[in-house]
Amino acid sequence: MADKEAGGSDGPRETAPTSAYSSPARSLGDTGITPLSPSHIVNDTDSNVSEQQSFLVVVAVDFGTTSSGYAYSFTKEPECIHVMRRWEGGDPGVSNQKTPTTILLTPERKFHSFGYAARDFYHDLDPNEAKQWLYLEKFKMKLHTTGDLTMDTDLTAANGKKVKALEIFAYALQYFKEQALKELSDQAGSEFENSDVRWVITVPAIWKQPAKQFMRQAAYQAGLASPENSEQLIIALEPEAASIYCRKLRLHQMIELSSKAAVNGYSGSDTVGAGFTQAKEHIRRNRQSRTFLVENVIGEIWSELEEGDKYVVVDSGGGTVDLTVHQIRLPEGHLKELYKATGGPYGSLGVDYEFEKLLYKIFGEDFIEQFKIKRPAAWVDLMIAFESRKRAAAPDRTNPLNITLPFSFIDYYKKFRGHSVEHALRKSNVDFVKWSSQGMLRMSPDAMNALFKPTIDSIIEHLRDLFQKPEVSTVKFLFLVGGFAEAPLLQQAVQAAFGDQCRIIIPQDVGLTILKGAVLFGLDPAVIKVRRSPLTYGVGVLNRYVEGKHPPEKLLVKDGTRWCTDVFDKFISADQSVALGELVKRSYTPAKPSQLVIVINIYSSEHDNVSFITDPGVKKCGTLRLDLTGTSGTAVPARREIQTLMQFGDTEIKATAIDIATSKSVKVGIDFLNY
C-alpha cells in the first residue's frame, strides 16, 4: 500500500511496520484495522496550536488537595492578575486567599457549602446530626491513587458513606464557577456570561490521562465548558504553571535559599525561614488590592539566563510533589521540557499520615478508626488543630507544640478503653509526647520534625535521582513552589542537599504561584513549546507475517493470507520530545466499506522497546473511536481511508480525523475512562 501522507513530514522518528495492509476483522474483538502509512510525526504547528478564541477573560482554578482558589485576568489587560476575594473564616496565621478543599452535602446528598463555610458549618453541627451529613476533604488524591479510575469511582465521606467522585468534583467546580462569575459581574457592573470565559484547571503533571479526562468531564458536568466547545477549557499542569509565572519574577518577588550570591538581601547563611517570614509579612501588608502586576517581558531573573540554560521546578503541594525540568528559549522566553515530569505522593498530607500513625501508637488503631466514624466532626477539629501546629514547625524551634484534643476525643476514649488519655500516654512509651493539664498533647520540636522526615526524605531522594539524569546536569536554578514549600523544614533540607549545585529560589507568594501561572498559561497556551511523553503509546495492528522475524504463536491465517497479530504500532515513545503542534499521522481502513464506527484499543507502556501488545508492562489504557456516520458520499468507495491526526505535545492527548474520499471531518473520541 502506498504511503498516503501529505507533504510537510519531518521524516520518521521511529521504525515503521515493514508492511501494513488492510485485513478482515479479528476474532478477538478488535476491528480489523492496520495502518496504511508508516509511523511519521509531522510538524503542523500552524494548524494545531490552540486557536485564539474571543474570550473576554481567563479564569484559572487551582484545584488543590488541601486548598483551592481562583484568579483571573482580562484578555485586554493580561499584565493584571486578580486573585479571588478573601474568604470568610480561616485559621489564625494562615493566609485565606485560598479556601480548604472541603465540601459538605446535606443528608439528602444535595450540595450545601464549600471551603471554610463547609468546614465551619460541619464543626458546629450536633455530633449525632453530623453523622448524617456528608463531609469530604483532601479528596483530590483519589484521582492519583486509584488505578482503575472510572466515571463511577466512589469517594468516602467522613461518616463512612459513599458518594460518586464525579459528582463531588463537579459540585466543587460549579461552586468556583458561580463565585468567579459573580465577582466578574460585580466588577463589570453587568451580567458576565460563561461563554465569555476561558477556564483553566490545574492538575499535577504526574497525573495519568484518565485523571485528566475525569477532571475535564467534571468540568463539563459543572457547566464550565462542553464537549462541543472543548477549547473553552484548558487543563494546565501545576509545575508548568509555576514555571511560567517564575519567568516573570522581579528580584523583590523572590527569596533565595542557596549558598550562592544573595538575592533580595537574603542569603543562604541566614536562618532558613527567616527571609521567608519577612517576605510573608511584606505580602500581608500589601495584599489589599488582590491585583498582581506581571511583566510584559521576561522577569529580571532571566537576565542572568542564556539560551539553553536549565532549571528545575519542584511543586510541593498537599498531595503530590511534581518535578519538572525546563530549558529557556530566548528571546521570547518560550519553554522546552527536558525530562518527563516525575514525582509522587510526597505532599504535606504525608505529615498528617505520620501524625495519624503516632495517634495509633498512643491510643490504638482500633480506637482512632472508631473515633473517625463515631465522631467525624471532632476528628476534623483535631486535624485542624494539628495543621496549625504543623505550620509552626521549624528547624531552630526549641519550645514544645501544643495540640488541643477535642473534649469528645477525651470522653470517647475513656468510654472506649475504660481509662484516661493521660493513662494512655504514660503507657505508650512515646517519651516525646506528653499530656498537658489543659487538655493538650505537648509535642517536643524533635517529635514534630520526625513527622516531616519520611515525606521530606522522599522528596530529597526523588530530587537526587533526577539530578543524576544527563538532561538535568548543569541546572542553574531550582524553584521551590507550592503550599508545602512554605515549610522551613523542607526549605532547609533542599538547601542542604542542593544549595551548592544550583540557586534555590522561592517566590514570595509561594502558595499563589501556580494559580497566577495558570492564568498566564490560559492567556498564552503555546508558551510551552516542547514537552516529553510520560509513556509509550500505540495500538495493536496486523502486519504481514514474516518467517523468522515474527513468533509462530502470532501467526493468523485468514482467507489464505498470513498475518502477524498483536503487533504494537508505536505512536510515541516514553520520554520522547514532542513539540506543540506536532502530529502523529495514521490512516486506517474499516473492515467493511459500510462500517460506521471504528474502535481502536490504545496501549501504553513505561518502556520504549515494545514489539507486541502482549509484552510485559504493556497495558490497555483507552480507546480511539472514529464515528464515520455522515461522512460517506452517495457512492461508498470499496476501500475507505480514514486519516487520523494525534497530538501528544499538549497537556492532554488530542485527535482529529478526516475521511479522505469525501474530505469530511470524522468525529473522534479518545476515552481513557470508559474502555
Curated annotation (Swiss-Prot):
Chief site of localization: cytoplasm
Superkingdom of origin: Eukaryota
GO molecular function, one term: ATP binding
GO BP: import into nucleus; inflammatory response; liver development; macrophage activation
Positions in coiled-coil regions: none
Keyword Glycosyltransferase attributed: no
Region ranges (Disordered): 1-45
Residues found modified as N-acetylalanine: 2
Signal peptide (from-to): none
UniProt feature, compositional bias: Polar residues: 16-25, 34-45
Keywords assigned: Acetylation, ATP-binding, Cytoplasm, Nucleotide-binding, Nucleus
Gene3D superfamilies the record matches: 3.30.420.40, Actin, Chain A, domain 4 (3.90.640.10)
Job of this protein: Adapter protein for SORL1, but not SORT1. Delays SORL1 internalization and affects SORL1 subcellular localization.
Subunit architecture: Interacts with SORL1 (via cytosolic C-terminus); this interaction affects SORL1 internalization and subcellular localization.
Protein name, UniProt field: Heat shock 70 kDa protein 12A
Organism of provenance: Homo sapiens (Human)
Gene symbol of the encoding locus: HSPA12A
